[in-house]
């Protein structure tokens, strides 16, 4: 996430620094600078070919088209970004599924969690981020994920049932000027960069100079997530908004439950290994 800290970027920020009220207005309309969409070409037939990290998967003849699914590495080695070349949730929308029990409202997420080794699923505007279990092999997971994504988009089913747009950075009537600026900065400068890495950052609150944020997708379990928050996000917020003293990563109840379950599982596994008889027969 050193992209947050480049001198050129800070110089640009200094040159464009505005008053607090002007700042809120100036952020509106700034869009992502990167386009991941990949065109689909009209074809018939079926089959697949692999080359240079790009997998071509052809839909059934009835669909009369091909889907090109590209993968992109993320800062987290346990997460991989899949770009199907079509909108997943549409511009500005994201949805996080940290485990299979949270996938009840998404037919696509349910199918992806059936792939052995998949630990988490995250949907972005035009990408799907898959987080794998530790020790699982991408060489085994990727082909199945490709097939699931291709078949799903050929089916025409909705990615989400009863989908709700992101509301964490929506400007509310009771938001003061500081909160408004924080939300605008997150939406226009910070969130697009994080989403390029296959994750998202969600505004959870602001109190006493502390901005509370939640990391999602590839960023949620990334080893550098704390560094990203402190050296990247915090620096940018403080540069524009002097009222911000620090940034804090928060975890919701679901995160704590998952962490607790993993700790319990690891403890039981360690106990079982200790109880196993040592190798070698009686002397």
From Swiss-Prot:
Disulfide bonds: none annotated. One of its GO terms (cellular component) is mitochondrion. Residues 1-65 form a transit peptide. Keywords: Iron, Iron-sulfur, Metal-binding, Mitochondrion, Transit peptide. SMART domains: Nfu_N. One of its GO terms (molecular function) is iron ion binding. It is found in: Mitochondrion. Molecular scaffold for [Fe-S] cluster assembly of mitochondrial iron-sulfur proteins. This is NFU1 iron-sulfur cluster scaffold homolog, mitochondrial. The lineage of its organism: Eukaryota, Metazoa, Ecdysozoa, Arthropoda, Hexapoda.
């Amino acid at each position: 996430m050193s992209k947050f800290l480049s001198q050129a970027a800070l110089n640009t920020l200094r040159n464009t620094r505005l008053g607090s009220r002007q700042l809120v207005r100036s952020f509106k309309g700034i869009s992502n600078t990167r386009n991941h969409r990949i065109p689909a070409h009209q074809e018939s037939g079926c089959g697949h070919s692999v080359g240079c990290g790009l997998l071509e998967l052809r839909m059934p003849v009835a669909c009369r088209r091909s889907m090109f699914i590209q993968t992109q590495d993320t800062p987290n080695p346990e997460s991989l970004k899949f770009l199907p070349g079509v909108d997943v949730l549409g511009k500005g929308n994201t949805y996080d599924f940290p485990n299979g029990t949270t996938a009840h409202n998404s037919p696509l997420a349910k199918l992806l969690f059936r792939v052995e080794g998949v630990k988490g699923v995250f949907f972005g505007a035009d990408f799907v981020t898959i987080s794998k279990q530790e020790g699982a092999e991408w060489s085994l997971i990727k082909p199945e994920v490709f097939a699931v994504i291709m078949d799903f988009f050929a089916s025409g089913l909705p990615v989400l049932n009863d989908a709700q747009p992101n509301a964490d950075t929506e400007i509310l009537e009771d938001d003061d000027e500081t909160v408004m600026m924080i939300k605008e900065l997150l939406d226009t400068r910070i969130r697009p960069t994080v989403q390029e890495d296959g994750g998202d950052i969600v505004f959870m609150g602001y109190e006493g100079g502390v901005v509370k944020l939640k990391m999602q997708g590839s960023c949620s379990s990334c080893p550098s997530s704390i560094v990203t928050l402190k050296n990247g996000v915090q620096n940018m917020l403080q540069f524009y908004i002097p009222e911000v003293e620090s940034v804090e990563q928060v975890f919701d109840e679901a995160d704590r439950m998952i962490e607790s379950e993993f700790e319990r599982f690891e403890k039981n596994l360690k106990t079982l290994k200790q109880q196993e008889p040592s190798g070698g027969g009686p002397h």
